[in-house]
Regions:
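N-terminal active-site segment of His-dependent metallophosphoesterases
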Residues: 1-59, 143, 147-152, 165, ...
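Active-site neighborhood of phospho(di)ester-bond hydrolases with catalytic His/Asp-centered motifs
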Residues: 5-6, 46-50, 70-76, 109-110, ...
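Metal-dependent catalytic neighborhoods of phosphoester/phosphodiester hydrolases
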Residues: 49-65, 79-90, 119, 133-136
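A short, structured active-site edge motif that brings together acidic residues
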Residues: 71-81, 95-100
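Conserved beta-sheet core of the metallophosphoesterase superfamily
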Residues: 87-175
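A cross-taxon signal for low-complexity, glycine/charged-rich
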Residues: 188-191, 206-208
Length: 216
């Protein structure tokens, strides 16, 4: 079975005010427990970016405890680890972009949302539970799905679960269950790079970054 998730941010305290946990230790413990309750060793999990915090170390102690065959599509918090090579110990592949088939459904995977209206689905992270200008745009695009743990009950989910959770998020049905979004990142966060089918895109990081591709 194939699962999707994003924006775990293990060990990252600044996100606590926007999550229902009293400490980083509790957050990490719940994320690991819910992952392993859903995923078996034979399952495949695509992590669509941001396993930790860009200026720290790879959270290997947490990643080593997660079940399944894991694949990372890097986000802006996965490119600046002091020991970035350690990611390859915990993930079978580490890429900036990926395309797969989930059964008969074609899937595009990128940390940053791509405006997409064609066959299959585009699965992203990065936005957490943000309600900025991108929210109104993406709620009109049901083929663009947010895999972030903040809108998926802090666990990896299958494609049908992801579709339903996004429907509930964009309809406002789950508003009472989702805390406010995290604070904006520090200024001057460097750059982010995402791969796309017709080449690569490089842009300065800013909250709510959306990649617009006419060829997808």
């Amino acid at each position: 079975m194939i699962f999707y998730t994003a924006d775990l941010h293990f060990h990252y305290e600044p996100f606590l005010p926007s999550r229902p946990f009293g400490s980083v230790e509790e957050m990490d413990r719940v994320l690991i427990a819910r992952w392993n309750a859903a995923v078996s060793e034979d399952d495949t999990v695509y992590v669509v970016g941001d396993v930790g915090y860009n200026r720290g170390l790879v959270p290997g102690d947490a990643l080593a405890r997660l079940r399944g065959h894991k694949h990372l599509i890097r986000g802006n918090h996965d490119t600046g680890f002091e020991n970035a090579g350690e990611l390859y110990r915990y993930f079978e592949t580490v890429t900036d972009f990926n395309e797969i088939d989930d059964g008969e459904v074609h899937i595009i995977l990128c940390h940053y949302p791509i405006l997409y209206r064609r066959r299959g689905y585009m699965i992203h992270g990065h936005l957490h539970q943000a309600r900025g200008p991108e929210y109104g745009m993406l709620r009109q695009m049901p083929r663009v799905l947010n895999a972030g743990v903040d809108v998926n009950f802090y666990r990896p989910v299958t494609l049908p679960q992801l579709i339903e959770n996004n429907r509930a998020f964009y309809s406002g049905e789950n508003d009472a269950l989702i805390p406010p979004p995290p604070p904006p990142p520090p200024r001057g966060g460097g750059s982010v790079t995402a791969g796309c089918r017709a080449g690569r895109i490089s842009a300065p990081f800013r909250p709510g970054l959306i990649l617009i591709r006419s060829d997808l």
